[in-house]
């Protein structure tokens, strides 16, 4: 088993990774739904970057792209069958509804019943919020009003 960090041979490695992830993830979600567990369970599938939309040098891989990538949420309180955000036609930059990491984390915390504005830590003598002062809940992905 390889990983998603495909600086070379992206076609084969991503095809293999997608096969490893696709059916088991769908089976997990369907099984949890069938057992009535999905309504109380939040599933988060995330990454910190995507891949560039063009090949790296003369190779067969792609470099990191921190500007546009995909994450998904399923289950407890997440709107079903919904896509939020959009990249440009090349998948290089965000074209609509950008989401910062702080927003994504604030939304996850909200779905877990936690007020992200009250969660903080001390660093260098300052109290800092986990979601910084910029993080906000992405209300459009919620199945109910926040």
What are these regions (language model features)?
Residues 1-146:
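Ligand-binding pockets and gating/stacking loops
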